[in-house]
Amino acid sequence: MKSVFTISASLAISLMLCCTAQANDHKILGVIAMPRNETNDLALKLPVCRIVKRIQLSADHGDLQLSGASVYFKAARSASQSLNIPSEIKEGQTTDWININSDNDNKRCVSKITFSGHTVNSSDMATLKIIGDD
């Protein structure tokens, strides 16, 4: 009886761990402090080049106004892609997923993501959190 309980408990724990790993492959790629004046050279450099198929943007602190974003891939010719992003993100809001077309088989990795924008409606700097999904 004790061995049946032990096996059942082990299976239950392994199923929970398995499903948890599969349910959330999202990773926080980084956080950028947004200045109060419009700036077009805000960059999030990824220390480890990683394959990212889509991203979400979140305003953790303060409201943001964005005027552009680009993704740079680690490739021989420094390929990049302009992203279609919302122009404004309010504090506490998270965008829908924004697809990144790295290539046909999604094998190129992202080395840097750049943003243009600034903080609005606040004397403090807003923070932009970038979440990736592979």
From Swiss-Prot:
Residues 1-23 form the signal peptide. Keywords: Signal. This is UPF0412 protein YaaI. It comes from Escherichia coli O139:H28 (strain E24377A / ETEC). The gene is yaaI. It comes from the Bacteria. Belongs to the UPF0412 family. Pfam families: DUF2541 (PF10807).
